[in-house]
Design a protein with these regions (language model features):
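Conserved class I S-adenosyl-L-methionine
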Residues: 1-37, 51, 55, 75, 133-158, 162, ...
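Conserved acidic residues
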Residues: 40, 61, 103
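Class I SAM-dependent methyltransferase SAM/SAH-binding core
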Residues: 43-94
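A short acidic, Gly/Pro-enriched loop at the edge of an enzyme's catalytic core
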Residues: 93-104
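A short SAM/SAH-binding and catalytic strip from SAM-dependent methyltransferases
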Residues: 104-117
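A short glycine-rich, Lys/Arg-flanked "PGG" loop and its adjoining helix->strand segment in the class I
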Residues: 118-133
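Short alpha-helix
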Residues: 163-178
Length: 179
C-alpha cells in the first residue's frame, strides 16, 4: 500500500497532463455518467485529481471523492468551487462511511492497480445501497498488441503499480464474479 501511495504522491502534479491524451474518451464517459448520478449521493473511490467528480458534480446531489494519496487530493482540491463536492484522503479497503449510504459508487481506472481488487469491491458493496449503481470503467492491459506491450513496458519502468492485467472480457467476468 505504501509503495502505491508513494507512486501517486510523486506523480500527482503530472497526472492531468498524462490524462490529456484520453480527453475525448473521458468527455464521453462524463456524458454517460451524468444522467446516472442525477440528484444522487455519490462516492468516487480513487478519484486521483478529481477529474470525474469535477465534471459530473453539477448533476449529482452530493459527491464524496476519495483517494489514498494525499498529494492527489491536494491537486483535486485545486479549482473545486462546488459545495456539493468534498475531497478526502481515504483507504478504499476501509471506508469510513456507513453501510448502504451511497446511491452510486464510481471506481474508475483503479481496480487493476490494487493488489486485492476483490477486497476493494467488497468494501464498495458495503457502502452502496441495495438498489445502487456501481460504475467501474477501467483500462485493460492484457491485449497482446505490440503498442500495448510497449506501453506496459514503459509503465512498469516508471513504477506504475499494475497488479491485474485483464482483457475486457476477463474484467467483466471479474466484476460479475464479485457482485
Amino acid at each position: 500500500m505504501r509503495e502505491r501511495k508513494n507512486f501517486w504522491d510523486r506523480n500527482a502534479g503530472l497526472y492531468d497532463c498524462f490524462m490529456r491524451k484520453d480527453r475525448a474518451v473521458y468527455e464521453k464517459m462524463y456524458e454517460l455518467i451524468r444522467p446516472v448520478v442525477k440528484d444522487k449521493t455519490v462516492l468516487e473511490v480513487a478519484t486521483g485529481t478529481g477529474l470525474i467528480a469535477k465534471h459530473i458534480v453539477k448533476a449529482a446531489a452530493h459527491i464524496e471523492a476519495t483517494d489514498a494519496s494525499p498529494e492527489m487530493i491536494t491537486e483535486a482540491k485545486r479549482g473545486n468551487y462546488s459545495a456539493k463536492l468534498r475531497f478526502s484522503v481515504q483507504d478504499m479497503f476501509s471506508l469510513p462511511y456507513a453501510s448502504k449510504s451511497f446511491d452510486v459508487v464510481i471506481v474508475s481506472n483503479a481496480l487493476h492497480i490494487v493488489p486485492q481488487p476483490e477486497k476493494s469491491l467488497r468494501e464498495i458493496k458495503r457502502v452502496l445501497k441495495d438498489d445502487g449503481v456501481l460504475i467501474a470503467p477501467t483500462f485493460t492491459h492484457a491485449e497482446n498488441s505490440f503498442p500495448g506491450k510497449i506501453k506496459a513496458f514503459f509503465m512498469n519502468l516508471a513504477g506504475f503499480p499494475l497488479h491485474s492485467k485483464w482483457t475486457s472480457e476477463e474484467y467483466l467476468k471479474f466484476l460479475q464474479q464479485n457482485d
